[in-house]
Amino acid sequence: MESVTVIGAGLAGSECAWQLAQRGIPVVLREMKPEKKTPAHVTGYFAELCCSNSLRGAGLENAVGLLKEELRRLDSLILRCADATAVPAGGALAVDREGFARMVTESVLGHPNITMVPGEVTAIPEGNVVIASGPLTSDALADAIAEKLGGGHTLNFFDAAAPLGTFDSVDMDSAYFASRYDKGTPDYINCPMTKEEYQAFWAELVKAEEAEVHGFEDSGVFEGCMPVEVMARRGEDTLRFGPLKPRGLVDPKTGREPYAVVQLRRDNADGTIYNLVGFQTHLKWGEQKRVFSMIPALHDAQYLRYGVMHRNTYLDSPRLLDRYYRLKSDPRIAFAGQMTGVEGYVESCASGFLAGIELARRLKGQAPLDFPRETAIGALGLYVSNESVADFQPMNVNFGIIPPLDHRVKGKRNKNAELSQRSLAILDTMKEEVLSL
């Protein structure tokens, strides 16, 4: 049996390698960590979550909830590890960041069909290759990819991560546990602000000194990871209608909704580390400490990691890739993960999943397994390969890329839930063939 080289052991690469190995395909997994790390990585584990620890909404009224359920039913390694290391997060699936990455790493390294070869890859290998090196691909490999693709086929945007702080340093006399509208369990720490406190905070935030990031412009930021200071510049109330919105978060001390609320989400299973929800930033570290200390409950907060910003590179995929994430000009090469233009942890996993199982089928002489566009997995593959998309941008999974129902359903949540049920019904008819090893 021919082997496959998978470059990169992030979410997409780990999932892809696992799916190939499960189907009897020998895999050589190349990963430059721990010998060389990117600016966003901290540990040497595979599948390290560099931004939030949340895999977003869990319900089937959310497109990402549907995508997770599809992957879960099809034996995704990433979803299995995420479920096993989940931490309380209201209606979202959030994980113990280190525990999750450790479990993925141990699973991948323990598979008999996967051989790990550490070290940086500087050229595209011969034979069957899946490039899942991520948006922070090293310069040498990025140059090799650019040479293979020709000029003008790589694009970029900027991404940011939020700070991580310790629970013990949060002033709980000025904060309270609650979930929005009391849905689920009260898993979030809520840090309320009065009008005067918020206005003073906003005034300092918009003029705080930013770290230098070569080539950064506000217009080059992905909306889903907009730095909090960039969002604040859009207007004094922008944050209050965004990540700091107080709706449904009644302060038990006053019996009223605060003027603004900063939410903290648990980042590990022990509940000793929390991240500032929506506080992606590229302020200088000293400025982060100064400005964020103006939030009453965080006046003495201790940070384990300050927010950082980095450039993300992705492909002009509609011109380059087919629906299986293969290079149209050279099908022995496939890509997976955020560099294909899918945005988000779960979306990256899905691309690695599909690239892996389709490559395994090709190597076994089997026909491609076409996931229809009614499924979230299929819709993502068709989005990144749709040549009619002129201005290709990274995108999260959403119901807009899935065909509508053939009948009217009252209410958006009900409609989305029915779209999900249709997708899962289709998926269940394919399940046996997908899982055949």
Predicted regions: what is each one?
Residues 48-59, 83-99:
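Dinucleotide-binding Rossmann-like beta1-alpha1 core, especially the glycine-rich loop
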Residues 276-342, 349-351, 369-386, 392-396, ...:
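A glycine-rich dinucleotide-binding beta-alpha-beta segment and adjacent secondary-structure elements
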Residues 97-116:
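Helical element adjacent to the flavin cofactor pocket in flavoenzyme catalytic cores
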Residues 348-369:
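Internal hydrophobic alpha-helix adjacent to the cofactor/substrate pocket in enzyme cavities
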